[in-house]
Structure formats: C-alpha cells, structure tokens
C-alpha cells in the first residue's frame, strides 16, 4: 500500500487558476510572473500527495465542519479537502489572501 494521495482540482479551483493567470498576465501586464505564480501554486498543491492533513483546518463555518484545510502559497490561499478512505485530495478553491474569503463563501450559500 502506498502512502501517497491522488491530488485533483475542482472545476471552481481550475477556474480560479485561470482567473489568477489572466489577472496577473493581462491586468498587471506580467505574463512571466503569471506563469511563475501558477507554477508555484501547482508545485505546492502537488506536495499535498504526502501527509495532506499537515495544514490546519479553516476556523470558520461552513468550511470548518467540512474539514476544509488551507495552504498558503505566496499571497494566495489554496483550500482543499482530504478523503482518507479514497486517499484523495481535492482542491476546492484558490483565492487571493487579501480578499474577504469567509464573506465570499458565506454569500454563496
């Protein structure tokens, strides 16, 4: 039996990555920076294949009850779920850390 987890992205998380790239490349006019930033995010997400629960749970609802973890990467925060039975990690969302993330999540209930 392997100790590694399969890591995947939700549709929302993939959209978040596209939006992050688009904003940095097109609004800030820094496509190289956008590519590098996505590379750093993806590298950290890939590292969740081993001991994914090492990062803390969020402390606000409803995500705390869902056992949502958060992983900071530069100015961004990756939110993900761990399924120990399936040995799987699913990245749920990726947000810029300066946003009111709790407010965004709770407004989408």
Mark where each language-model region is.
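Intrinsically disordered, low-complexity regions enriched in small/polar residues
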Residues: 7, 11, 23, 57, ...
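Basic, Lys/Arg-enriched alpha-helical interface segments
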Residues: 1-65
């Amino acid at each position: 039996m392997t100790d590694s987890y399969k890591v995947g992205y939700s549709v929302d998380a993939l959209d978040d990555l596209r939006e992050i790239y688009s904003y940095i490349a097109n609004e800030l006019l820094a496509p190289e920076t956008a590519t590098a930033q996505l590379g750093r995010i993806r590298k950290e997400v890939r590292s969740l294949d081993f001991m994914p629960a090492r990062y803390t749970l969020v402390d606000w609802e409803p995500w705390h009850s869902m056992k949502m973890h958060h992983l900071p990467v530069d100015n961004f925060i990756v939110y993900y779920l761990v399924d120990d039975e399936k040995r799987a990690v699913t990245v749920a969302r990726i947000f810029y850390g300066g946003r009111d993330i709790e407010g965004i999540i709770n407004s989408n209930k």
